[in-house]
């Protein structure tokens, strides 16, 4: 009986720890969906900026506010579609979402500046709009912007105004490969 009680106590403690950590970081709102992970890697790059470098003004709120070009390689054959998320993990009130795109043909190897491929859908960003919203940190701050590309092994069913959390939940257990490119922007 003691072993059973210890197991139950251990399970309760583990559940409590998971429950407490699941709610961390979102600025008081609902807990963010976990980021899907995969064993295979997609290479993500841009002709507009290098890993860790400054995102061009053109792709920010201070410029034309158009998405930068993205190139990706290593997409596995089992991919049904690609998904792109752009997030600012340095935002003062938790991760700020700048772009949510799904339905990209897995044979695409690039997105041009300001382009959205045929058949792709854009979800709701943290500005409350569908589409790309460029980096726009508070004056005097420099933030990181994570451009994530996911290869989904099944096409997720999502509403037209899906959020990044909706997309992440749909990708759990369906992510064949994943890659990121991080850029910076300061004002």
Language-model features: locations:
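N-terminus-centered regions that define maturation/targeting leaders and the start
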Residues: 2-187
């Amino acid at each position: 009986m003691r072993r059973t009680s210890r197991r139950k106590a251990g399970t309760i403690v583990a559940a409590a720890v998971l429950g407490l950590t699941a709610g961390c970081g979102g600025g008081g709102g609902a807990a963010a969906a976990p980021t899907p992970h995969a064993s295979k890697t997609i290479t993500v790059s841009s002709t507009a900026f290098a890993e860790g470098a400054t995102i061009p003004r053109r792709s920010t709120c201070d410029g034309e506010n158009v998405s930068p070009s993205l190139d990706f390689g290593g997409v596995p054959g089992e991919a049904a579609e690609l998904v792109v998320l752009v997030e600012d993990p340095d935002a003062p009130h938790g991760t700020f979402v700048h772009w949510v795109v799904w339905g990209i043909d897995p044979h695409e190897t690039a997105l041009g500046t300001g382009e959205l491929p045929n058949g792709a859908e854009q979800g709701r960003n943290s500005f409350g709009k569908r589409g790309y919203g460029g980096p726009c940190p508070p004056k005097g701050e420099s933030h990181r912007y994570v451009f994530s590309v996911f290869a989904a092994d099944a096409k997720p069913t999502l509403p037209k105004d899906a959020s990044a959390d909706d997309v992440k939940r749909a990708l759990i257990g369906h992510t064949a490969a994943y890659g990121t490119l991080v850029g910076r922007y300061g004002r």
